[in-house]
Amino acid sequence: MIRQRTLKEIVKTTGVGLHSGRKVTLTLRPAAANTGIVYRRTDVNPPVDFPADPASVRDTMLCTALVNDEGVRISTVEHLNAALAGMGIDNIIVEVDAPEIPIMDGSASPFVYLLQQAGVETLNAAKRFIRIKKPIRFEDGDKWAEFVPFNGFRMDFEIEFNHPAIESDEQHLLFDFSSQGFVKEISRARTFGFMRDIEYLQSQNLCLGGSFDCAIVLDEYRILNEEGLRFENEFVTHKVLDAIGDLYMCGHAIIGEFRAYKSGHGLNNQLLRAVLADAEAWEWATFEEEVGSPVAFAEPGMVLA
């Protein structure tokens, strides 16, 4: 059968918080079958746990943030969550000693490397997929996102940025998910922002960790990073990365096609909530044979980078 996965060993790294600009220590710990994905703040006493759940997402203004009833939060979880989805990790404890996950280079690639460093352990329990059974759509003005039944996990995403540096023919991406495809084609895409917005946020004491090291930065006319883009469609690819992370907030791989136009963290989360709230829209699926799986995860020992 296709089994649940966790890490072989504990791994740790440090980085900078995007909003605070301060050093953050991130620790990833193995967890038993059916634990799920749990984010944990260790700098509060007692530590506070946030199980991966779309209902825990209560702020999507600048990132995806998990917030509990007491107002304790962990921000910027989406890139790490995308790496967990990409590597097929079902059970893990993610510990941070700050209110946010470190931003690293603004992509999911450092987290993929960290997970590969820890190694992947298969557990003696069936991996549970969420299979989409009927179309569900969520709209917000001209923006929309929808799930339709599909025997695999496909992302069909379109953005619309009227900017000289963002080519009009590089604003659409169709991606059929596999671990290998995620690592090679998606994980290295960085977040992006406009210099005017970053300057304004920093004047409000936000985005203090924002820099050319962790984002693609644009002015009105061009990309300001000396090294330019990692690949031509990096902008839409990063939006797909974000969506993979946002949708994995249900803690399970999805079998279905996600289509979106100008969607962001908020819309992705609202769609996920709408799907899970409709008992006729989805069902649990497990697979006795690896060969029969519509979603391809890499073998645990395989190096993908």
Curated annotation (Swiss-Prot):
Keyword Lipid metabolism among record annotations: yes
One Pfam family this sequence matches: LpxC
Family: Belongs to the LpxC family.
One Gene Ontology MF term: UDP-3-O-acyl-N-acetylglucosamine deacetylase activity
Name under which the protein is recorded: UDP-3-O-acyl-N-acetylglucosamine deacetylase
Tree of life domain: Bacteria
Cofactor: Zn(2+)
Signal peptide (UniProt feature, chain positions): none
Key words of the record: Hydrolase, Lipid A biosynthesis, Lipid biosynthesis, Lipid metabolism, Metal-binding, Zinc
GO BP, sorted A to Z: lipid A biosynthetic process
Provenance organism: Vibrio atlanticus (strain LGP32)
GO cellular component, one term: membrane
Reaction catalysed by this enzyme: a UDP-3-O-[(3R)-3-hydroxyacyl]-N-acetyl-alpha-D-glucosamine + H2O = a UDP-3-O-[(3R)-3-hydroxyacyl]-alpha-D-glucosamine + acetate
Active-site annotation: H265 (proton donor)
The protein's role, per its UniProt record: Catalyzes the hydrolysis of UDP-3-O-myristoyl-N-acetylglucosamine to form UDP-3-O-myristoylglucosamine and acetate, the committed step in lipid A biosynthesis.
Pathway the protein contributes to: Glycolipid biosynthesis; lipid IV(A) biosynthesis; lipid IV(A) from (3R)-3-hydroxytetradecanoyl-[acyl-carrier-protein] and UDP-N-acetyl-alpha-D-glucosamine: step 2/6
